[in-house]
From Swiss-Prot:
Annotated effect of mutating S248A: Abolishes catalytic activity
Record's protein name: Aristolochene synthase
Protein family per UniProt: Belongs to the terpene synthase family.
Gene behind the chain: prx2
Textual note on the cofactor: Binds 3 Mg(2+) ions per subunit.
Annotated knockout phenotype: Reduces the production of PR-toxin and leads to a large increase in mycophenolic acid production.
Binding site for (2E,6E)-farnesyl diphosphate: R340, Y341
Entry cofactors: Mg(2+)
Function as written in the Swiss-Prot or TrEMBL entry: Aristolochene synthase; part of the gene cluster that mediates the biosynthesis of PR-toxin, a bicyclic sesquiterpene belonging to the eremophilane class and acting as a mycotoxin. The first step of the pathway is catalyzed by the aristolochene synthase which performs the cyclization of trans,trans-farnesyl diphosphate (FPP) to the bicyclic sesquiterpene aristolochene. Following the formation of aristolochene, the non-oxygenated aristolochene is converted to the trioxygenated intermediate eremofortin B, via 7-epi-neopetasone.
Reaction catalysed by this enzyme: (2E,6E)-farnesyl diphosphate = (+)-aristolochene + diphosphate
UniProt-reported outcome of changing N244L: Abolishes catalytic activity
A Pfam family matched in the record: Terpene_syn_C_2
Enzyme nomenclature, EC number: 4.2.3.9
Keyword terms of this UniProt record: Lyase, Magnesium, Metal-binding
Amino acid sequence: MATSTETISSLAQPFVHLENPINSPLVKETIRPRNDTTITPPPTQWSYLCHPRVKEVQDEVDGYFLENWKFPSFKAVRTFLDAKFSEVTCLYFPLALDDRIHFACRLLTVLFLIDDVLEHMSFADGEAYNNRLIPISRGDVLPDRTKPEEFILYDLWESMRAHDAELANEVLEPTFVFMRAQTDRARLSIHELGHYLEYREKDVGKALLSALMRFSMGLRLSADELQDMKALEANCAKQLSVVNDIYSYDKEEEASRTGHKEGAFLCSAVKVLAEESKLGIPATKRVLWSMTREWETVHDEIVAEKIASPDGCSEAAKAYMKGLEYQMSGNEQWSKTTRRYN
């Protein structure tokens, strides 16, 4: 009889395994994108990179969630495996320490799964759901062990704090900001791109991704250095949000027609700009693609200025800025290949 591990591995085999070179682990584009194939993004000067442990971590983390999360059907299992949440984490944080990347994969995976749950809830129900999880994440309240979202979050945060309490605790509040943004009623009344980008900086979890990257890389920046990164992070949030919105638009537009009228409400840069500019959806996506490349140029310019400044730049700050670049390039690579959007 097969062991549970072998059963999980067999179930996951068609969807999760990647081949990657030992020295340069780049993710293969094994999925032909079906989302807006007539729209070609402008060329980018950046290259993506993937964490070298992507295959083993993906198998480990997917196996954990297959064993512990209550998926309602095999179709839901397949959808989960196709999404490759650990892969996107390894693309976001390719420079993460080997003994920390699995923490980041588990956290982003459970947050993605919770986000899917919220699509079928009203804002009030979603807010109550998240408010229950926040004190559990802090360790102030013990979880109900019959509810996967509760014990998974509790055990994960406890293990992260045991590994590095200082940097783990820096991830907590940004995570809560992200969770609150998911049920923010403001998303129902956003009609201007600038307003949308301000909201999306919280909803895309930019502060969460930044803090989680510092945890996963073991980076300790001074308070002054963190403050000095605000403009760079805000620029990064715009690029991340819009690239994600371009690729996820078709999936989210469909969800808005089939999910809860609040939880699945379509709030996207594509929709906002199309309505504001009176352009069609394909034209709006082309305009947004040009904007993303301009934000990449802005990132490079800010980084060059910081490195050339008379005050200099610490090695930790340089690593952090390079990490932000990899977040953006990695997000684009995952967004254009994941079956979650394509």
